[in-house]
């Protein structure tokens, strides 16, 4: 087995190996530099030296409040509030979670940049997973692609859903008339969403959703596809009579810790606006 093959088993991506080669890192066997083509022998000690984390020059530190659920030297788990972007955009160039993370790192003396493993739309609330260095990011990104980063969402949709539980297996791609909107299309990427109803009345349904894939706007598109757009989601057919944003919350997250191999589980309670909506206090 070569160093390259073994590194892959450790979760070191090809991209990260390239960064190690050209970014100031090193691969050593028994204290001597080797290339990725080196064939490992019994008793070899492999040392991987990762390049020093480069702090982004374009991402500014801003004192954005962060609700930190967990933090160690490898990962950061955050409960994002609604109306806060994950990263800066042209429409919202500042005040993002990423800006707040940079500020948090500077305040706590951590030399790192932002490695988001999971992102949320600006109006979606709930749990986000962040890696604090490239190795953790590489492992967690691979785990996510293999369905090992589990996310469960809570949503409120318009109308009473007839089916108490089910699976939407419908490919998602860009809408031909929009750079933002997505749609179910035969030539889109595979997208699978599992759902089950938690409570309902004639006007709306509270539903729990588990993602098998992670396409942009996946839950919003799939619920609209079923004829039950999210309350507040005007992009996909919802109205804002009851709530001022799409009623979507990342409620549960579980993953295997990239370094300790511990089973990590987190829960974020519903924000006040969604809790009131479910209780019928918003209308």
UniProtKB/Swiss-Prot annotation:
<dbReference type="InterPro" id="IPR020103">
    <property type="entry name" value="PsdUridine_synth_cat_dom_sf"/>
</dbReference>
<feature type="active site">
    <location>
        <position position="121"/>
    </location>
</feature>
<dbReference type="InterPro" id="IPR050188">
    <property type="entry name" value="RluA_PseudoU_synthase"/>
</dbReference>
<dbReference type="GO" id="GO:0140098">
    <property type="term" value="F:catalytic activity, acting on RNA"/>
</dbReference>
<dbReference type="GO" id="GO:0000455">
    <property type="term" value="P:enzyme-directed rRNA pseudouridine synthesis"/>
</dbReference>
<dbReference type="InterPro" id="IPR006145">
    <property type="entry name" value="PsdUridine_synth_RsuA/RluA"/>
</dbReference>
<protein>
    <recommendedName>
        <fullName>Uncharacterized RNA pseudouridine synthase YjbO</fullName>
        <ecNumber>5.4.99.-</ecNumber>
    </recommendedName>
</protein>
<dbReference type="GO" id="GO:0009982">
    <property type="term" value="F:pseudouridine synthase activity"/>
</dbReference>
<dbReference type="InterPro" id="IPR006225">
    <property type="entry name" value="PsdUridine_synth_RluC/D"/>
</dbReference>
<dbReference type="InterPro" id="IPR006224">
    <property type="entry name" value="PsdUridine_synth_RluA-like_CS"/>
</dbReference>
<keyword id="KW-0413">Isomerase</keyword>
<dbReference type="GO" id="GO:0003723">
    <property type="term" value="F:RNA binding"/>
</dbReference>
<comment type="similarity">
    <text>Belongs to the pseudouridine synthase RluA family.</text>
</comment>
<dbReference type="Pfam" id="PF00849">
    <property type="entry name" value="PseudoU_synth_2"/>
</dbReference>
């Amino acid at each position: 087995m070569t160093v390259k093959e073994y590194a892959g088993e450790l979760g070191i991506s090809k991209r990260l190996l390239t960064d190690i080669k050209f970014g100031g890192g090193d691969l050593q066997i028994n204290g001597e530099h080797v290339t990725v083509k080196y064939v490992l022998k019994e008793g070899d000690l492999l040392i991987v030296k990762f390049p020093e984390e480069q702090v982004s020059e374009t991402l500014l530190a801003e004192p954005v409040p962060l609700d930190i659920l967990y933090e160690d030297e490898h990962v950061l788990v955050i409960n994002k509030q609604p109306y806060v972007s994950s990263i800066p955009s042209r429409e919202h160039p500042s005040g993002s979670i990423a800006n707040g993370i940079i500020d948090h790192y500077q305040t706590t003396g951590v030399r790192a940049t932002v490695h988001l493993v999971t992102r949320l739309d600006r109006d979606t609330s709930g749990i986000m997973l962040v890696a604090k260095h490239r190795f953790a990011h590489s492992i967690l990104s691979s785990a996510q692609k293999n369905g090992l980063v589990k996310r469960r969402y809570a949503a409120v949709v318009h109308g009473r859903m007839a089916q108490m539980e089910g699976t939407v297996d419908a490919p998602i791609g860009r809408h031909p008339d929009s750079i933002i909107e997505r749609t179910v299309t035969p030539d889109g990427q595979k997208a699978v969403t599992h759902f089950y109803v938690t409570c309902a009345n004639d006007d709306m349904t509270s539903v729990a959703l588990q993602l098998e894939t992670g396409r942009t706007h996946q839950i919003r598109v799939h619920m609209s596809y079923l004829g039950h757009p999210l309350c507040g989601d005007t992009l996909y057919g919802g109205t804002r009579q009851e709530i001022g944003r799409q009623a979507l919350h990342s409620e549960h997250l579980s993953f295997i810790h990239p370094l300790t191999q511990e089973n990590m589980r987190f829960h974020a309670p519903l924000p006040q606006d969604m809790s009131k909506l479910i209780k019928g206090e918003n209308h």
